[in-house]
Amino acid sequence: MEKFLKPNKAVILLQGKYAGRKAVIVRAFDEGTRDRPYGHCLVAGISRYPKKVIRKDSAKKAGKKSRVKAFIKLVNYNHIMPTRYTLDEDLKDVVKDVVNADVLQARDKKVTARRTKARLAERFKTGKNRWFFTKLRF
């Protein structure tokens, strides 16, 4: 069977705190690991989407509305829905030191999420991957 859950593939999370949020696969663990003996992947996604900016908004308000908040998480394959989209932004170097689950603890996770946030915010401001930065309507 061909592996289609590859890095840079956009997915939608189906379960948990970030259900309904869009994310991108950073690294896939098809065979599982010792801690998680099932197929899972490391995803980086958007926990708070940027709001729509209108013409009459001041520069300060427009800046606040275009903020992006990111997260990183290990997710079971059963809890994601792949989409046809891919992000050409490679986030692998942002989370290069993430090899196992114990690296994803509170402090390191926050630092990595902050670096991911900066990368995604830059992507949003350039106007690329517009679909990824819009809230999913359902």
Curated annotation (Swiss-Prot):
> Which keywords fit this entry according to its UniProt record?
Ribonucleoprotein, Ribosomal protein
Q: Which Pfam family would be a valid example here?
A: Ribosomal_L27e
Q: Does the keyword Cell membrane apply?
A: no
What Gene Ontology terms describe where this protein resides (cellular component)?
cytosolic large ribosomal subunit
Q: Which GO terms describe its molecular function?
A: structural constituent of ribosome
Q: Which GO terms describe its biological process?
A: translation
Identify the PROSITE patterns for this entry. RIBOSOMAL_L27E
The family classification in the record reads: Belongs to the eukaryotic ribosomal protein eL27 family.
Q: Which PANTHER family match?
A: 60S RIBOSOMAL PROTEIN L27
What protein does this entry describe?
A: Large ribosomal subunit protein eL27
